[in-house]
């Protein structure tokens, strides 16, 4: 089993059948959910039109005005992808969806047996979780914060295996694997600097406030693995020769993560961007 991940190197040995005993085709569709996420309140944000498939279309690329400014601050008005800064409340988080398709085919070409096995799967799932974090000074509770985190995870994978069996006990196998894992996270965290309201009274409302401070965080992480392996098994009388060659490429991209902090302003009864602690 191989998964897209963050690793520096290593060897991947792909061992799978490539000549099915009989031809087949299977398909499956699944829908699932949980009581804390499905059809409940969560947070998300608009990224790109292809987010549902786990691919960014360039919307999250670092704006040219920021990329070419030598690390200096720029006016927020020149940013072209401000939509990714705005977190939205979704009162009906969708159910999880998955689909799969697999098939195998084998035939004789003269004295040689040829076979192929292919499979593909796709899933789009959601998960909302809440967490409380507290800090204490000299034995007394100093600050307390409650956060809600909604993750939209899209996974896609595919496999294609080809095989040839020759009459002289020679075998050739070619296996290709593609795995992609995308995590889109929206997180809202509210905090009190002086403890007056028990958090047990607020958790069910999922951050309706008012809090002393609010933090909006968005992230988008794409991980991808592509690997191909060719194997040859040859017999020449008492001599056996095994050859193996493989190529793998793993990628991780986390474009343009942002955190925006707000402070509650009592005179206006609303929140203003906190410019004192930029991130």
Set out the residue ranges of the language-model regions:
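Transmembrane beta-barrel wall of Gram-negative outer-membrane proteins
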Residues: 73-192, 223-230
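Transmembrane beta-strands of outer-membrane beta-barrel pores
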Residues: 31-35, 122-126, 178-182, 236, ...
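A beta-strand signature from Gram-negative outer-membrane beta-barrel systems
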Residues: 1-27
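Short beta-strands and strand-coil junctions in structured, solvent-facing domains, enriched
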Residues: 1-3, 20-21, 33-36, 107-109
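Residue-level detector of the transmembrane beta-barrel scaffold of outer-membrane proteins
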Residues: 24-28, 115-119, 171-175, 231, ...
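Flexible glycine-rich, low-complexity coil/linker segments exposed to the extracellular/periplasmic environment
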Residues: 37-92, 268-279
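Membrane-embedded alpha-helical bundles of multi-pass transporters/translocases
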Residues: 47, 87-88, 104-106, 244-247, ...
């Amino acid at each position: 089993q191989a998964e897209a991940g963050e690793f520096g190197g290593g060897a991947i040995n792909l061992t799978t059948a490539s000549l099915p005993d009989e031809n087949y085709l299977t398909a499956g569709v699944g829908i699932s959910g949980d009581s804390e996420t499905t059809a409940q309140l969560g947070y998300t944000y608009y990224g790109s039109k292809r987010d549902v498939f786990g691919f960014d279309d360039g919307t999250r690329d670092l704006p040219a005005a920021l990329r070419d400014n030598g690390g200096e601050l720029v006016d927020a008005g020149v940013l072209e992808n401000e939509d990714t800064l705005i977190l939205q409340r979704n009162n009906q988080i969708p159910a999880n969806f998955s689909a799969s398709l697999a098939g195998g085919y084998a035939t004789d070409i003269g004295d040689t047996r040829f076979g192929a096995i292919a499979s593909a799967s796709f899933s789009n799932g959601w998960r909302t979780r809440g967490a409380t974090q507290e800090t204490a000074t000299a034995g007394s509770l100093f600050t307390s914060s409650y956060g809600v985190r909604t993750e939209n995870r899209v996974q896609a994978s595919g496999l294609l295996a080809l095989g040839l069996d020759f009459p002289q006990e020679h075998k050739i196998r070619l296996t290709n694997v593609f795995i992609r894992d995308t995590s889109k996270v929206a997180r809202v965290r509210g905090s009190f600097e002086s403890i007056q309201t028990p958090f047990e009274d607020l958790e069910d409302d999922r951050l309706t406030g008012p809090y002393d401070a609010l933090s909006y965080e968005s992230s988008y992480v794409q991980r991808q693995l592509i690997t191909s392996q060719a194997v040859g098994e040859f017999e020449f009388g008492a001599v056996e020769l095994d050859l193996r060659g493989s190529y793998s490429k793993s990628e991780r991209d986390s474009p343009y993560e942002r955190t925006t902090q707000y402070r509650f302003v009592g005179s206006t009864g609303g929140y203003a961007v906190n410019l004192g602690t930029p991130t």
